[in-house]
Amino acid sequence: MQKLWEGRFSEASSALLEEFNASINFDKKLYKDDIEGSIAHSSMLANCGILSKDEVDKIKNGLNQILNEIESGNFEFKISDEDIHMAIEKRLAEIIGKNTAGRLHTARSRNDQVATDFRHFCMRENLAIAELLRTFVKALVEIAEKNIQTLMPGFTHLQHAQPISLAEHLLAYAFMFKRDFERFISSYERNNFSPLGSAALAGTPHMIDRFETAETLGFKAPMSNSMDGVSDRDFALEILFNISVVFTHTSRLCEELILWNSQEFGFITISDAFSTGSSIMPQKKNPDVAELIRGKTGRIYGNLISLLTTMKGLALAYNKDMQEDKECVFDSVKEVHTSVVILREMLKTAKFNEKNMLKACKKGHLTATDLADYLVREKNIPFRKAHFIVGKCVATAESLGLDLSEMSLENLQKIDGEIDENALKCLDLFNSKNSRKSYGGTADESVRVQIEILKKWLKK
């Protein structure tokens, strides 16, 4: 099979080389970006007087025919074509003739063509993933709004710590995913510049208009340095990093859902639609969705490390190593789309078991800090002394087989006479939760403020 670059060569390519060198099996995903880039490039060449109107019309018609062939499944992808860019150019030559098709590549190298296609793909995905995260935040806010007064134990070190609102817990994730959204938007704003026209590395002697192609393709402007345009993949690293952070957050949430779904916790029941069974144990109902997302996180991290390692030792400008930039991005992009959607839908159909959460709040002395704060605030006792007093109260409660909230005033006063009837109010779980009215706290009114913040953001 004739190569578009074979003029300098006297021998045909080895079949081993063709198989090893080809990227068409995965970079064919960029077909639409490549065709859009070529149409924009040909229009610009015509506007600059480099191509005639007739030539451009033939090129555009041919490219649109190729687009239809690919999308209808009638385009034959061949390893011998090496990559999607060469495959499209070769097919274009078959449709409109070699001479006219060959003029499309005027003032363009595969280096800037590839960089443009890939950057265009990543910019589009930055926006698509951001929108996906927005819908996830919306779902979390809706669930939280229904559970402002649902009490559950808050944890540190996976030990019972303080009583909190389930809404507060879910909103913590909502704010994390909000920041994830902002990272993708920030990456889009920072990287939405066009490499097209950088050519191989040093620009081109043809009098082209890079600003025109940048605008046509939705970029803010052309990249200011042609070597930078073809050499770097920081935009790809950023989308991989951003997706890795999303998976850090989804993995943490999934870990909690797995725990909460267990018989030991019983805080949540995942619907049958998002659970699986066992091949041998008839009673099993497994949280496989959450486990898979948690498991996929390692692969997502690996994709980021893979590209970081690929790029770290490359001299400017383009190197073939950079062909390894795409599979990791395509994989991470696919996984973030599927994982966020299924996690969102699983949460929307899950049932939170309020009785079990409340029951759990009556274990672990969740209001101990409230009693210490009361002694500091109302009795002017230094916090370290108050901490010691309440520690004694907890030890006594445990020796009696009670939770601190179940201790009588008589037993508490035996430990320290400063503890009075008003102190008992601090031991009430709901009083404890609603006393934490500081900005961002778990009191009902503070949680409603958080919900309003997110609702206003969602409307923007």
UniProtKB/Swiss-Prot annotation:
Gene Ontology CC annotations of this record: cytosol
Single GO molecular function: argininosuccinate lyase activity
Location relative to the cell: Cytoplasm
Gene Ontology process terms (BP): arginine biosynthetic process via ornithine; L-arginine biosynthetic process
Pathway the protein takes part in: Amino-acid biosynthesis; L-arginine biosynthesis; L-arginine from L-ornithine and carbamoyl phosphate: step 3/3
Keywords: Amino-acid biosynthesis, Arginine biosynthesis, Cytoplasm, Lyase
Name of the protein described by the UniProt record: Argininosuccinate lyase
EC number(s) stated in the UniProt entry for this protein: 4.3.2.1
NCBIfam families with a match to the protein in the record: argH (TIGR00838)
Keyword Lyase: yes
Domain of life of the native organism: Bacteria
Class of the enzyme per the UniProt entry, highest EC level: lyase
Amino-acid biosynthesis found in the keyword field: yes
Similarity remark: Belongs to the lyase 1 family. Argininosuccinate lyase subfamily.
Catalysed reaction equations from the record: 2-(N(omega)-L-arginino)succinate = fumarate + L-arginine
Alphabetical list of InterPro entries matching this protein: Arg_succ_lyase_C, Argininosuccinate_lyase, Fumarase/histidase_N, Fumarate_lyase_CS, Fumarate_lyase_fam, Fumarate_lyase_N, L-Aspartase-like
